[in-house]
A protein has these predicted regions:
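Active-site metal-coordination/substrate-binding segment of hydrolases
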Residues: 2-65
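Histidine/acidic-residue-rich, glycine-tolerant segments that coordinate divalent metal ions
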Residues: 61-78
Length: 78
């Protein structure tokens, strides 16, 4: 099983709501707003954490390959 994730974020942009900037996460109600919150940066962490939890619980799984890159997934040059 291939688990893919990229760590890059989109460039800082305008259009944020008042009090919501691109670099400081803010909790409003039950929602967390922050830079890259809707991007893929935490998918790799979630995948690795899930594999670890499964192993610690004694579960079995197929061979997992985790691919993490730091470039934009639509135009990776390296």
């Amino acid at each position: 099983v291939l688990l893919y994730g990229h760590l890059d974020k989109q460039p800082e942009m305008t259009g944020w709501f008042e009090g919501l900037g691109p670099w400081t996460p803010v909790l409003k109600g039950d929602k967390l707003y922050g830079r890259g919150g809707a991007d893929d940066g935490y998918a790799a962490y979630a995948s690795l954490t899930a594999i670890r939890a499964l192993r610690e619980a004694g579960g079995k799984h197929a061979r997992c390959v985790v691919l993490i890159e730091a470039c934009e997934e639509s135009g990776s040059y390296d």
